[in-house]
Amino acid sequence: MTDTLPRRPLLTGWTGRAAVAALALFIIARGLAYAGPAAPAGAPSILGVIDSVAPTWLWGIVYITAGLLVVAGTWWQRLWTTGLILWAIAQSVWIVGYVVATVTGLAPRGWVTAAAIGPGLALAFLLLYLGPPPEGDEDG
């Protein structure tokens, strides 16, 4: 008996590909939200913490790229994994940003958003552990 879960594909066939595509659309939508105009100068915002790492428009590009990689990954496994890792890295930076904003008083309830992002990040790691949809699997 083993102490760990067996490594096997979580998503198979078109059903799995549809689930991955839905996740990708969410990631792309978040990227599009950040690609818009910046917040007015002097407006207190969590984005001030995140903007110290990279400008908001760049975060938009990162999220859109991750989402497109996940979409492409429904057919090419390596891209699926790369997209999820890129998304997980971006999400981790935003979690840290919200925690820093909470500690510094910029966003006293920022920890709530950080905690809300956490389950998505946990899902990404679970998907990475269990594996991408198998290549050539057309059964649904």
Task: Give residue spans per PLM region.
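Alpha-helical transmembrane segments of polytopic membrane proteins
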Residues: 54-63, 110-120
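Membrane-interfacial loop-to-transmembrane alpha-helix junctions, especially the N-terminal start
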Residues: 19-20, 79-87
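Hydrophobic transmembrane helix segments
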Residues: 17-57
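Juxtamembrane helix-break-helix junctions at the cytosolic face
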Residues: 67-82
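Membrane-helix boundary connector in multi-pass membrane proteins
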Residues: 78, 85, 92-114
